[in-house]
Amino acid sequence: MIEDVVESLKNGNLTPEDYVEKTYEKIERVEKLIHSFITIRNKQEIIDEVKKNISNKHGKLAGVLIAIKDNISTLGIRTTCASRILEDYIPPYDATVVEKLKSEGAVIIGKTNMDEFAMGSTTETSYFGPTKNPWDLERTPGGSSGGSGAVLAGGIVELALGSDTGGSIRAPAAFNGVFGLKPSYGTVSRYGLIAYANSLEQIGPMAKNAEDLELLYDVIAGEDWRDATTISINKNEYKRDGSSKVDLKNIKIAVLKDILEASEKPVTSAFNEILDKLVSEGVSIDYIEFKLAEYALPAYYIIAMSEASSNLARFDGVRYGYSAHYDGIWKDTYGKNRGEGFGIEVKRRIMLGSFILSAGYYEQYYIKALKVRRLIKDEIDRILKQYDFIASPTMPIIPPKLGEVVGDPLKMYAMDLNTVIANLAGVPALSQPIGFYNNLPIGLQLMGSYLSDYKLINISKNIEKISKYYNLTANI
């Protein structure tokens, strides 16, 4: 538990030198196999910072090492979005979540690999090369926060931040056997997150158990005047309402049949096994229809690609970022900068988004997608008024082999079937490990009603006690 690490650092049972040295020994041994980082900070700098931060006796994370996804701005530390166009970009400011981490004494060890601009489900679209799953080096760790998932499963650090636009925290959590939370939209500031799709994405915590997940979420959540989409909440009341002891006998869970039917047999078997255990503990489970499931992926990708084409228009290689150099014609220079600076998947989504937003297609596609999103949100809200949670496998498949889906966009997009619904509805969703198939982790996803984040984490604590799957580290 992270609280034990903090206590050991503060009372001197664990010295900063030993703590950091052991971590860098793991990096030396494991990182060359999994490639979870894009940038790793200097060891002596980290030791000095840990020493300084443990003097902060009140810091919840005093001296704790944490890995940050490389689309979250970090003052003085390269932030690339795993793209050539931002290969040498160093932000002049910290994201709000990074400020909050530092205020509690956390130390950023480095920036994790990801799909380029968070566009992908396997961490194979990174300009810096793919990350490999610590449980099987021939397989993907999921995406787009694959580096953050792999760095936990590889045993390098205990905490990481990711971002989730359509499942980008939960997919790597499932494929790496760790915990990940996509928070309620507006509960965590997006200031400093390099945008992909503003209306869908959230920064969220990743950890190896529910207790540490809650601690990290508690640090990063809260209103921020620099992000107008954040909401004002009484954090203590919000936490108290969700953290009170959950009596499993009073819990009602809905399973969406339409989603479950699309899952592979090993995934379904692990999912049914944990449901049986929950039923034996007194949980009530109903299988219900969700006829809008078939429209979730098309609506999600239409909205996400449209927002991406707008957000990424700012990257032209003139003011900052990769430049192919001015050749006398600005139009050609812009085109060359973007053509060489962006990868194939990013260019695909920009072009599709531009097409969707063009005259004649805007109402036919984009407006219809927004209407479908509203219908999905209303239906999810209706279900969550009758049930405490909605359960599904996090991913419909086991981790695919590297190269298996990245060359087939439709196959890659279909991996997000179970996860995009929470982003469209703006509700919190959590993934945690519930089993293995051929040494490959399988995850359970739970969705809760808006602002039920702490309640979601609390039920996760109950489930990890029942399943015994937590604090997992791959034997690598």
UniProtKB/Swiss-Prot annotation:
Allows the formation of correctly charged Gln-tRNA(Gln) through the transamidation of misacylated Glu-tRNA(Gln) in organisms which lack glutaminyl-tRNA synthetase. The reaction takes place in the presence of glutamine and ATP through an activated gamma-phospho-Glu-tRNA(Gln). One of its GO terms (cellular component) is glutamyl-tRNA(Gln) amidotransferase complex. This is Glutamyl-tRNA(Gln) amidotransferase subunit A. It catalyses: L-glutamyl-tRNA(Gln) + L-glutamine + ATP + H2O = L-glutaminyl-tRNA(Gln) + L-glutamate + ADP + phosphate + H(+). Keywords: ATP-binding, Ligase, Nucleotide-binding, Protein biosynthesis. One of its GO terms (biological process) is translation. It comes from Sulfolobus acidocaldarius (strain ATCC 33909 / DSM 639 / JCM 8929 / NBRC 15157 / NCIMB 11770). Its EC number is 6.3.5.7. Belongs to the amidase family. GatA subfamily. InterPro entries: Amidase, Amidase_CS, Amidase_dom, AS_sf, GatA. Heterotrimer of A, B and C subunits. The active site is at residues 69, 144, 168. It is an enzyme of class 6 (ligase). GO terms for molecular function: ATP binding; glutaminyl-tRNA synthase (glutamine-hydrolyzing) activity. Gene3D superfamilies: Amidase signature (AS) domain (3.90.1300.10). The keyword Nucleus does not apply.
